Amino acid sequence: MAERDHYHTIDDPNVPCNFYDTVNLTGHTVFPNGSYDYYGTIVPAELVGTYDYIHSSLTERIEVREHVRGCVCKFKSCLNICCPWRQVFNSEVDGCIIDHSDNRTWPDPPMLNITFRNDSTILVNMFAQFAIQSFRPCPKMFSLQPETSHWDDYLLFENGSMLRVDDQQLIRKNEFCMVPTYVNESDMFYTIHPANCDMQDDNSTVKIINAYAMMFSIPFMMLTIAVYLLIPELRNQHGKSLVCYLVGLTVGYTSLCYVQLYQVDATGDACKVFGYTAYFFFMGAYMWLSVISFDLWHNFRGTRGINRFQEKKRFLFYSLYSWGIAVVFLAFTYIAQELTNLPAYLKPGIGDGVYCWLDMSNWAAMIYFYGPILVIVVANTIMFIMTAIKIHGVQREMARIIASENSTKNLRTEKDKFGLFLRLFLIMGITWLTELISYFVGSDKGWSKLFYISDLANAMQGFLIFMLFVMKKKVKHLITNRCSSVRDGSNQRQSQYSTKTTSSSVANLSLHEKPSVEKPLVISSSVDPQKTTIFR
């Protein structure tokens, strides 16, 4: 709050009022007594001053030629518009322009619902009710459109301030501006709504923390992938599925980290590339999670867990299923964003000039991301429950009969796998389920703070998976054996190379020596010929 107050108080002491309470009087009628007529509002001489600067944003002051400004907001409520009336902001020129190709109708006069001190709400003429300022508080503005989402509901007050309903944030008049908006491309008229800044708040802070947590997590996922690829005993069906799952998470995390930490231009092609890449690999990862759940259930479906297909064919089928469905989701999302005229609140939002990732402020995230993941989590839960029931049934059956040693060992092995991947499911399923809940209550700042911990845990999944799948006793033993075998193999190869080199040297030497015929080689009878090595 102190920083926001700073925006309202800092200014030149030689001017009659703060810049944000002024309007530019250049070109307006001046009276002999020094007062000015500003669109029918008389600005007294004592509230007129010469300014040699402007504020191009809330934080940036620019020196300009001296010009006259009047403190009209000192005696009349002001309302800020982002661009002069009938002009729109153009990102290519980074300024306001008159768009002659735009055929939409501007409201004349613009009517706004204003809430007064007595809590009454009245539809008023914007130009009659307020003195109009034109100022863009920050480079990136986000318009509120209550027609598309109740999270965009707001209240405009008679003093020119605004209440953002979803988080009950009171926004001062110079921290937002009114902008012409439309819902559908086919709309032929503008509606005037406020646009607010992407201010640094608790939510953006959490995004930064999550990004660094993901960076911390990525090396652990890569280590887990390396361990499961390099150790033959771990390259079974479940191990290969885990590797594919981690590949999806690693690429997805890397893409999101780059977007969040390096501030990728939301209007550029790189934004779309990172956004769609992250989406594809995240969806692929969750399809592999469903594969793991299905394969565990499949192994317990029969009393002896007999596989129907050879492991290689089954892995190929699983790969086509997981990555294939991820491609289908990617195509569906891309078409919805790039090739349709859907309303903005039904588009994914990837690379739309505002977001590189999905738009989390409306139902788009539910349709294209959280919805499919919710289905996967529910399906995984059902399969895990069915597998647990089957394990319990097999245990009871084996307790009633004399089980063979192999059957008991196989059951124990499958139980270990089930327990391991059950913990993986708990890490992934429950964490993402809490994130789904946080998505629904995210507009309520009081509730959403409860999910900051789950968001952080979600971002640190790589570390948790590394501890679960690599730091277990059996895997560490396999790593030790693998390192020992590699070291022994290296020593053995070195020894063989040394032996061959020595043999070759002696052989070469014998070619240059004259054979001794006077003194033939004699082996002493005291030496066992079977244990004697002879180099000629």
UniProtKB/Swiss-Prot annotation:
The gene is mth2. Belongs to the G-protein coupled receptor 2 family. Mth subfamily. Residues 1-210, 263-273, 336-365, 439-449 are extracellular. GO terms for biological process: cell surface receptor signaling pathway. It is a multi-pass membrane protein. The chain crosses the membrane at residues 211-231, 242-262, 274-294, 315-335, 366-386, 418-438, 450-470. This is G-protein coupled receptor Mth2. GO terms for cellular component: plasma membrane.
